[in-house]
Amino acid sequence: MSGHKCSYPWDLQDRYAQDKSVVNKMQQKYWETKQAFIKATGKKEDEHVVASDADLDAKLELFHSIQRTCLDLSKAIVLYQKRICFLSQEENELGKFLRSQGFQDKTRAGKMMQATGKALCFSSQQRLALRNPLCRFHQEVETFRHRAISDTWLTVNRMEQCRTEYRGALLWMKDVSQELDPDLYKQMEKFRKVQTQVRLAKKNFDKLKMDVCQKVDLLGASRCNLLSHMLATYQTTLLHFWEKTSHTMAAIHESFKGYQPYEFTTLKSLQDPMKKLVEKEEKKKINQQESTDAAVQEPSQLISLEEENQRKESSSFKTEDGKSILSALDKGSTHTACSGPIDELLDMKSEEGACLGPVAGTPEPEGADKDDLLLLSEIFNASSLEEGEFSKEWAAVFGDGQVKEPVPTMALGEPDPKAQTGSGFLPSQLLDQNMKDLQASLQEPAKAASDLTAWFSLFADLDPLSNPDAVGKTDKEHELLNA
């Protein structure tokens, strides 16, 4: 009996454990979903159940910290490599610049710049040696993330699933226990079935819980080992770099020790640098102006003398201008008294004499002037030669291209427009009148002389043997003149 009683629960447990009906699965999934919903919404769970998993929660926090810090470390290593390359490039450029400037400067300062530039170029090359341990460090961190952390993460996910099943089975057992009545054996089979599910879920959960705790501990230890090994390599390389750089810089400092190219002065008051620049520019302008004034002083004196002479001449011209114009008007009035041949020869217009005579109010010629005018009038009016054979020969040789233009005649009652300006002409008005007449004479075609004897009478002095009076005469008239 005892053996039979002892063997009964195990047989019953095996029977309930093998119960995989659809109803049992649906009930199990229902309580698992309810537990997941409680966890997602953050509702308060049973404090005793939560306290039993305190050590597991601590390990999970450590795992999430390792996962997060490894990701940040990988990003920091990549950024650090970029910054080292950028710093080495800038340091190399600075070294090249100092060397180029040092070659141009032949003083000791140029030698200092050359030595410093070489040291900077050497330092930039040695700094790039840090990339080798950093690249190795980055590879190790990435391997650690993709292998160790990923494997632990899968184990944690399986553990969380089993914990949800276990806590769901506890909720299911709690609900069934409320309807249980041990005295009447009511709901006993149902309670035993749920109790069997709780035991199986706890067994799986405890196994995965142990795996997670062990893997998290191993993960933390492996990370410490990785960091200590890789950081030791990086630290050694960094120390070698600073040692070489410090020796190079110290050697440059010792070689140029005692060289002091600067002279220091103490300022009593601060001044604006812009004000100093403005004062320097003003001084330069003043000095340039003084030098230019001294250089231009002698030529300016000569120019001033010439200007004074021109002013004197212009003043004398202004004072004598009126007198010269009046004398010209006097001569014009005397010419109007001459006979027709003179007017034809000189192309003088009767209107000019009419306008110049009354305006100028010239007196009659005196003494020798009267005798000269009378002599000229007698010479030109001595004989009136007609156009004869000479005029035909002249036309045959030179052509009859001279066209006579009719002189515009004015009515007797119309006054002369040139004489309407008034009796008192100013010198400027007389000059303008002469210029207008001159332009009109240039624009008009030259008039043909009606009588060619006037020309021969003027040029008779050139050939005294020829007789100008015989031009255009017949043979009988020649004989009479010769007699």
From Swiss-Prot:
Biased composition (Polar residues): 288-303
GO terms classed as biological process: neurotransmitter transport; regulation of transport
Entry-linked PROSITE patterns: AH (PS50870)
Topology term for the membrane: Peripheral membrane protein
A Gene Ontology molecular function term of the record: membrane curvature sensor activity
Record flagged with keyword Cytoplasm: yes
Role of this protein: May play a role in neurotransmitter secretion.
GO cellular component: cytoplasm; cytosol; Golgi apparatus; Golgi membrane; intracellular membrane-bounded organelle; secretory granule membrane; synaptic vesicle membrane
The AH domain, residue ranges: 51-254
Biased amino acid composition, Basic and acidic residues: 308-321
Coiled coil: none
Key words, A-Z: Cytoplasm, Cytoplasmic vesicle, Golgi apparatus, Membrane, Neurotransmitter transport, Synapse, Transport
Organism this protein belongs to: Homo sapiens
Protein localization: Cytoplasm, Cytosol; Golgi apparatus membrane; Cytoplasmic vesicle, Secretory vesicle membrane; Cytoplasmic vesicle, Secretory vesicle, Synaptic vesicle membrane
Name the UniProt record assigns to this protein: Islet cell autoantigen 1
Any matching Pfam family: ICA69
The keyword Kinase is assigned to this record: no
Signal peptide segment: none
Superkingdom assignment: Eukaryota
Region feature Disordered, mapped onto this chain: 281-321
Expression across tissues: Expressed abundantly in pancreas, heart and brain with low levels of expression in lung, kidney, liver and thyroid.
